[in-house]
A protein has these predicted regions:
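Core alpha/beta nucleotide-donor-binding catalytic domains of modification enzymes
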Residues: 3-168
């Protein structure tokens, strides 16, 4: 339901309309925020309107083990990879953009990564039996939000994105 993901889904809708093929949007509900269920329902409604297959994948965090952001990220990718394999999808598109690329570099630098670790996110990365594709790496977040505004699309703003308590 975030701006970046909805912009990718909007572009996917047009791509699918012009080129055919099967596409699906996956929403991972981590059940970490009270508004998560409503946001998943909002995405489901929008995808139905756009004629895009949609599935909600649920992850329920274990209590009190710390490192929740990293665990949620690992669970998100595992859930999406498993779903793709079971449903015959080889490519998993994510909405990482230019700012995410810069944040990843800075986070890795802070953690003391070597030269290889400091390399940027690749546009395509094999992961198990699928390939993660990041088609928006060159896009600026402001441009993605502008695309949504120009098309009257409302997105959900995750308050934790503005929180510096977690490294992502």
């Amino acid at each position: 339901g975030g701006a970046d993901s909805l912009a990718l889904a909007f572009l996917l809708k047009d791509f699918q309309k012009q080129n055919g093929g099967r596409a699906a949007v996956l929403t991972v509900n981590h059940h970490l925020r009270p508004e998560a269920d409503a946001e998943a329902a909002m995405v489901a409604s929008l995808m139905k309107k756009w004629g895009i297959e949609h599935h909600v994948l649920n992850w329920f965090p274990e209590e009190g083990n710390g490192g929740i952001e990293e665990k949620a990220r690992e669970a998100r990718y595992r859930l999406m990879e498993d779903w793709c394999v079971k449903n015959g999808f080889y490519y998993l598109l994510t909405a990482h953009h230019q700012q995410d690329q810069a944040e990843t570099f800075l986070m890795r630098l802070q953690r003391g990564s070597g030269v290889d670790g400091l390399s940027a996110m690749a546009e395509m990365t094999p992961r198990g039996k699928i390939c993660v594709v990041r088609p928006l790496l060159e896009a600026e977040p402001a441009a993605l939000r502008r695309l949504l505004r120009e098309n009257g699309i409302v997105w959900a703003e995750d308050a934790s994105n503005g929180c510096d308590d977690f490294l992502r």
